[in-house]
Every structure is written in C-alpha cells, then in structure tokens.
Amino acid sequence: GADCQNFVYPASTTVVQQVNPVAPVVTEVLNLSADALFKFDGSSLNDLLPQGRVELDNLASNINNVYSQVNKIHLIGHTDRLGSDAYNYQLGSKRAQTVRNYLSARGIPNHVISYSTQGESQPLTDGCYIVKNKQALQQCLQPDRRVTVEITGVKGK
C-alpha cells in the first residue's frame, strides 16, 4: 500500500540554501575641524590640541568598533585662504599626514589610509572678505580649516 507508494515514488524533499546577505559597502564622510585638532597654523603631532587628541581617539575607536571591514580611509587636508597657495597646500598635506599617523598608531591599518590636500581650494565659507579685524577674520574662516575623512567599508560587527 502506502509504504510501497513512498518507496517507488519517494516523498519530495525541499532543499533550502541559506544565503548570508552581503552587507553593503558604504562611504561615510566626516569633517574634523582643524581648529579643534591643531593649534592655529599648526600641523605636527606636537601641535595637536588635547581636544583634538580626544576627537581622533574617538574616530579611531568608532572605526575599530563600527566597521567589520575597512576598505579604505582617505584624509583630505584643507586650509583657509590666509597665506600663499604653496604654503597652504603644504599645510593641508601635513595636517592630513599627522592625522594618518595618529590613526595608524591607534590600530587603524596603515595600508588602508591615504591622504591628500586641497589647500585653500575648497573653502566652506565665502572667504570672509568683508571682515577686516584679524582675530575676527581667523574666526570667520574657521570652517575652512579642516580634515575631511572618507571611510569606505562595511559597517556592523
């Protein structure tokens, strides 16, 4: 009867293949204020302010704890318009390089971190040309002094 029926025509089996979804690769862009990181016109490790060290420690911790995979981190140094183009280009590069070295010392693999500079070529302000007082001008141009951090990887641990 029924036993022979199952023997001749076996009950169908369903094979379910479990596929783990691939987490999307995302790029997160952060702007770190150079004024929070460095003394005015500074770019070296010795020029890092206490708050700047805290900010970079938090960034390194965030990268290490939030990302299961880091494909690349690109740092871009920016300056305000004060000073020559050549000087600002160099200053932006030195700031980005200092941030790279700091993150590397905090466990971020050196080979995933690259850096470049835009100098004064990508301001966030309108240049603050109407501001004449030197101290007020430095304050007005503050948003232009920054390091942009572009993190590309997979979030989630």
Task: Give each language-model segment a name.
Residues 48, 99-100:
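Generic hydrophobic alpha-helical membrane-segment signal
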Residues 97, 104-157:
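Periplasmic OmpA/Pal-like peptidoglycan-binding modules at the C-termini of bacterial envelope proteins
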